[in-house]
Amino acid sequence: MVLPTCPMAEFALPRHSAVMERLRRRIELCRRHHSTCEARYEAVSPERLELERQHTFALHQRCIQAKAKRAGKHRQPPAATAPAPAAPAPRLDAADGPEHGRPATHLHDTVKRNLDSATSPQNGDQQNGYGDLFPGHKKTRREAPLGVAISSNGLPPASPLGQSDKPSGADALQSSGKHSLGLDSLNKKRLADSSLHLNGGSNPSESFPLSLNKELKQEPVEDLPCMITGTVGSISQSNLMPDLNLNEQEWKELIEELNRSVPDEDMKDLFNEDFEEKKDPESSGSATQTPLAQDINIKTEFSPAAFEQEQLGSPQVRAGSAGQTFLGPSSAPVSTDSPSLGGSQTLFHTSGQPRADNPSPNLMPASAQAQNAQRALAGVVLPSQGPGGASELSSAHQLQQIAAKQKREQMLQNPQQATPAPAPGQMSTWQQTGPSHSSLDVPYPMEKPASPSSYKQDFTNSKLLMMPSVNKSSPRPGGPYLQPSHVNLLSHQPPSNLNQNSANNQGSVLDYGNTKPLSHYKADCGQGSPGSGQSKPALMAYLPQQLSHISHEQNSLFLMKPKPGNMPFRSLVPPGQEQNPSSVPVQAQATSVGTQPPAVSVASSHNSSPYLSSQQQAAVMKQHQLLLDQQKQREQQQKHLQQQQFLQRQQHLLAEQEKQQFQRHLTRPPPQYQDPTQGSFPQQVGQFTGSSAAVPGMNTLGPSNSSCPRVFPQAGNLMPMGPGHASVSSLPTNSGQQDRGVAQFPGSQNMPQSSLYGMASGITQIVAQPPPQATNGHAHIPRQTNVGQNTSVSAAYGQNSLGSSGLSQQHNKGTLNPGLTKPPVPRVSPAMGGQNSSWQHQGMPNLSGQTPGNSNVSPFTAASSFHMQQQAHLKMSSPQFSQAVPNRPMAPMSSAAAVGSLLPPVSAQQRTSAPAPAPPPTAPQQGLPGLSPAGPELGAFSQSPASQMGGRAGLHCTQAYPVRTAGQELPFAYSGQPGGSGLSSVAGHTDLIDSLLKNRTSEEWMSDLDDLLGSQ
């Protein structure tokens, strides 16, 4: 022992030392590599830092240059742009006049000289990098100074409208060097800059967002909203001002120009209202206390909310969020809203309020309109409100509150609106909620542009409803936020309710749907109950599919197209509900529909007191919903009745067929009875019957009935084609075996099966009849029948399940028919080639149906039913298959069934690939070209299912299995139940299966099962 140990140790030591040496060398290499990399990094770092500095400087220069150019353009061209807005033109001219034009021009020239001197060398670097892109955008935006450049908002129409509506403010600001003021005022006085942005919407947004973007990019620490907030805040003053290279005097001059161009009161009103309201949601309105506080708070708040939104690149957010306060939000809602309204008097608050005011004048009395007009003037005033102190905020708010109160009282006299507007705190809180929901509403604003006309009508009313309340306290954040959302809801609901209830419904709908309900609605989109009380049924049905933003569109669809829109969605909902109780869900929905109006009230209460307070709106919505619900219920009931009738017929047929099958089994000669294919197949049929029963249940689910009928006719087509194909595809061997097995089958089993399958698809019965026509032909026909039946059943099921997915629908459209019609027969017949013919007769028909599925989803349909069959059948009837067919192929089937879950993806691939292989064979056999050597292919098939990638047959099989998986997935579509319930249905039909199995001794069954399992 010692001797060997020593040598072992000796050998071990060298080995150990060698390993250690290698490790040491490797470590040394790593160290060298690390040191080399570090050295290179250090060597390159200075260059990298220099490049960063250059880029930063270039960006800075670009920002300054762009700012100066904007200031120059807005100061010089404003005369041209100002004329468009009649009111602003004089002010613009005055602002640009000797008083302001000279200082502005001087500042512009000075800044530009500095920029040119500093930037001209930098331009190359900038062009190479950020600067080039930025200058291009800024240049383009600058070229569209008025609103066309709405820049970040991308809502040029809004800003031009806003400018035209409140051009005096917007254009005046722009003309007064809006852009220069934009950054300058943003830096020194966010209020002024924000007012510019609010007013100009586009240009201020350009100058502010672009310059800020540049600025922010200059300062990577805070590139994003954080930077915006910080930069926009006091930091922005210190950072942006130095970056702009403008001294205090220049800043003062620029701000003075702004103040001169825009009345102080207007500036005060604008900033007080806009920013204050922004703060109300965000900073609790603390900003309005002092001009400086306002400047700082508004800066931080204004730039953070609005600018963040812009930089976030979420025009939706801008539109939806209180953040609209700035450019992005205000112009986004304004562009969507103001275009529809024809004037977003002030892109920001004015856009929200004046639009509300503008729409409201329709409903509001002259006094309210007068106040609205004041607000419209405030459009100018609001733009220029910024400079004003807190004292004017109170006056502006008072005016807003008065207008809002009058609007609320006069427009709808809805407590709802009065409730939100009366409490600025509430509005601020609600606005806060709004901003939080604004992200949710963002999609809505996006949709809002989709239906501007409806917005215009509805939006006007909605603003009347929504904005009046919003107007009062912090109308701008909440108002714009609600407005976009409300516009969506309004545009959707008004179409349904039109403007009849638009005043009531829109307000309530807007408050209800756009506020928390929408957010809740999105969160609960599946449930859709909290926020979908209005169109809850339709939305509930629809939301699972389309969710929040679509929910608005669907609201429009539901409201506008209650029957078509709601019905389909309702039908969708019932299918989901139908999964459990097919007919009950409709009633449940009907109940829910009936309850939905209460839901609306509840939701309204849940959402906001204003919405609850508008009982009229709730009542109108309830009535409308009730009508829609009733229609939907009727349609659903009809569908359910049809489905139930169809199911009853199928069940009746199945029962009769089962009886016939049992009788035939009993009456058949012992040899045939003992014949494994025949014996197993009838059992399979029985099992399939259970499966078909399950499938009928699936058919009962939702639209599957309609799709099933389609499938059946298709099956009928398949059947007729099947016979032809059967004759063509029938192989001599198949004909012999098929004659033996199938003929018996057709006589006793195929016809019953056909009837069974026919129960699933009335066609199979017909096919069952044709089978007698020719041994081979009907053998094939039974197969086809099975295929058609399985296909039909599967198709029905698949359409049920897949119908929702649209694949089965495509099949329903006819792809299923051609695929199933041609391939299934050939596939079936080839599969029929052996005793497998019986097995394939059932299994392959499914496969054939599934294989056609290769061309289309039909395999899913067939497979889905087949999968259910196979899981249930293969376990139960697979032994039968094993008897009827070599256990090995059958086992593959069952194994495929087991593997099915794995195969489905493969099957999808194979599905695509299989069709290609299939076509090469004769058309009849295309489906089963590989399968046509049913026995051999089946062997391969049995293997291929296991391999998932087996031969063509395997592919078909996999397809079939994926179909089963599809069945499992299909339940997801309509019958989340079908896959499970289908299997359960099969299990539920275990009695039937057992009764079929009873024909055989338990020992035989167990042996078959063992064989099947063993083969697996």
UniProtKB/Swiss-Prot annotation:
<dbReference type="InterPro" id="IPR048456">
    <property type="entry name" value="MAML1_3_TAD1"/>
</dbReference>
<dbReference type="GO" id="GO:0019901">
    <property type="term" value="F:protein kinase binding"/>
</dbReference>
<feature type="compositionally biased region" description="Basic and acidic residues">
    <location>
        <begin position="263"/>
        <end position="282"/>
    </location>
</feature>
<feature type="region of interest" description="Disordered">
    <location>
        <begin position="796"/>
        <end position="953"/>
    </location>
</feature>
<feature type="region of interest" description="Disordered">
    <location>
        <begin position="263"/>
        <end position="487"/>
    </location>
</feature>
<feature type="modified residue" description="Phosphoserine">
    <location>
        <position position="1015"/>
    </location>
</feature>
<feature type="compositionally biased region" description="Polar residues">
    <location>
        <begin position="116"/>
        <end position="129"/>
    </location>
</feature>
<feature type="compositionally biased region" description="Low complexity">
    <location>
        <begin position="413"/>
        <end position="426"/>
    </location>
</feature>
<dbReference type="GO" id="GO:0003713">
    <property type="term" value="F:transcription coactivator activity"/>
</dbReference>
<feature type="compositionally biased region" description="Polar residues">
    <location>
        <begin position="322"/>
        <end position="353"/>
    </location>
</feature>
<dbReference type="GO" id="GO:0006468">
    <property type="term" value="P:protein phosphorylation"/>
</dbReference>
<feature type="modified residue" description="Phosphoserine">
    <location>
        <position position="314"/>
    </location>
</feature>
<comment type="subunit">
    <text>Interacts (via N-terminus) with NOTCH1, NOTCH2, NOTCH3 and NOTCH4 (via ankyrin repeat region). Interacts (via N-terminus) with p53 (via DNA-binding region). Forms a DNA-binding complex with Notch proteins and RBPSUH/RBP-J kappa/CBF1. Also binds CREBBP/CBP and CDK8. Forms a complex with PRAG1, NOTCH1 and MAML1, in a MAML1-dependent manner.</text>
</comment>
<comment type="similarity">
    <text>Belongs to the mastermind family.</text>
</comment>
<dbReference type="Pfam" id="PF09596">
    <property type="entry name" value="MamL-1"/>
</dbReference>
<feature type="compositionally biased region" description="Polar residues">
    <location>
        <begin position="834"/>
        <end position="885"/>
    </location>
</feature>
<dbReference type="GO" id="GO:0002193">
    <property type="term" value="C:MAML1-RBP-Jkappa- ICN1 complex"/>
</dbReference>
<feature type="compositionally biased region" description="Polar residues">
    <location>
        <begin position="427"/>
        <end position="439"/>
    </location>
</feature>
<dbReference type="GO" id="GO:0005634">
    <property type="term" value="C:nucleus"/>
</dbReference>
<feature type="compositionally biased region" description="Low complexity">
    <location>
        <begin position="801"/>
        <end position="810"/>
    </location>
</feature>
<dbReference type="GO" id="GO:0003162">
    <property type="term" value="P:atrioventricular node development"/>
</dbReference>
<feature type="region of interest" description="Disordered">
    <location>
        <begin position="65"/>
        <end position="184"/>
    </location>
</feature>
<keyword id="KW-0805">Transcription regulation</keyword>
<dbReference type="InterPro" id="IPR048455">
    <property type="entry name" value="MAML1_3_TAD2"/>
</dbReference>
<keyword id="KW-0539">Nucleus</keyword>
<dbReference type="GO" id="GO:0042605">
    <property type="term" value="F:peptide antigen binding"/>
</dbReference>
<feature type="compositionally biased region" description="Polar residues">
    <location>
        <begin position="283"/>
        <end position="292"/>
    </location>
</feature>
<comment type="function">
    <text>Acts as a transcriptional coactivator for NOTCH proteins. Has been shown to amplify NOTCH-induced transcription of HES1. Enhances phosphorylation and proteolytic turnover of the NOTCH intracellular domain in the nucleus through interaction with CDK8. Binds to CREBBP/CBP which promotes nucleosome acetylation at NOTCH enhancers and activates transcription. Induces phosphorylation and localization of CREBBP to nuclear foci. Plays a role in hematopoietic development by regulating NOTCH-mediated lymphoid cell fate decisions.</text>
</comment>
<feature type="compositionally biased region" description="Polar residues">
    <location>
        <begin position="577"/>
        <end position="595"/>
    </location>
</feature>
<dbReference type="GO" id="GO:0005654">
    <property type="term" value="C:nucleoplasm"/>
</dbReference>
<keyword id="KW-0010">Activator</keyword>
<protein>
    <recommendedName>
        <fullName>Mastermind-like protein 1</fullName>
    </recommendedName>
</protein>
<keyword id="KW-0914">Notch signaling pathway</keyword>
<dbReference type="GO" id="GO:0007219">
    <property type="term" value="P:Notch signaling pathway"/>
</dbReference>
<feature type="modified residue" description="N6-acetyllysine">
    <location>
        <position position="822"/>
    </location>
</feature>
<dbReference type="GO" id="GO:0007221">
    <property type="term" value="P:positive regulation of transcription of Notch receptor target"/>
</dbReference>
<dbReference type="GO" id="GO:0016607">
    <property type="term" value="C:nuclear speck"/>
</dbReference>
<feature type="compositionally biased region" description="Polar residues">
    <location>
        <begin position="392"/>
        <end position="403"/>
    </location>
</feature>
<feature type="modified residue" description="Phosphoserine">
    <location>
        <position position="120"/>
    </location>
</feature>
<keyword id="KW-0007">Acetylation</keyword>
<dbReference type="Pfam" id="PF20801">
    <property type="entry name" value="MAML1_3_TAD2"/>
</dbReference>
<keyword id="KW-0597">Phosphoprotein</keyword>
